[in-house]
Regions:
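N-terminal targeting leaders
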Residues: 2-11, 17-181
Length: 181
């Protein structure tokens, strides 16, 4: 008789746990977890065909709402980012706050010169070997912002110095992050 009572208690606890998990999933659209949505959003953004070193895409996930942030050089990249994220299971709303940088021949010249200055520097040239280099160069009306991740503080400082040495640059905002910090 005791064994039967213990068996029913264990069965009741198992059912209560399963019911709690179902309730947790019901609170999230489609049962999708925030971690899974975050991984899929990152994957979709990195896989965009025209996403490059002169673009910066960021995002935040809050429940089923994905907020897209950053700056891009092509208007089509802004809409492509929104469309690729919209179809992820569990995403109910996409807020697109991506800024399209203005067309400017001078900014284009600065982009190319900054790319050459940074990625031709011994020590920083190893970053250029990746499909999407980790140092993103954002140029907006002559103002350069460096965004991304580097291995050391000296790499961060060197990239800032190299970008600051480009002719026509008004200011450099070095927002590079050092791995592990």
């Amino acid at each position: 008789m005791k064994r039967i009572a213990i068996g029913f208690c264990l069965l009741g606890l198992a059912l209560a746990g399963a019911q709690q998990r179902m309730a947790d999933r019901a609170g999230q659209p489609g049962g999708a977890s925030a971690d899974r949505i975050t991984r899929e959003v990152r994957h979709e953004l990195v896989m965009l065909p025209y996403y490059g070193v002169f673009d910066n895409l960021a995002y935040s996930v809050n429940g089923g709402t994905v907020t897209l942030l950053g700056e891009v050089t092509r208007p089509t990249l802004k809409s492509d980012a929104e469309n690729s994220v919209k179809h992820i299971e569990g995403v109910t709303n996409v807020v697109n706050q991506i800024k399209v940088l203005p067309l400017s021949p001078m900014d284009d010249r600065i982009r190319v010169a900054a790319y050459r200055a940074i990625y031709s520097q011994p020590g920083l040239d190893r970053y250029a070997l990746q499909a999407v280099p980790p140092i993103h160069i954002i140029v907006d009306n002559g103002h350069v912002t460096l965004v991304g991740v580097v291995a050391s503080k000296s790499d961060k400082d060197m990239a800032g110095v190299r970008a600051n040495g480009v002719s026509g640059v008004f200011s450099v905002d070095n927002q590079l992050q050092v791995e592990g910090r």
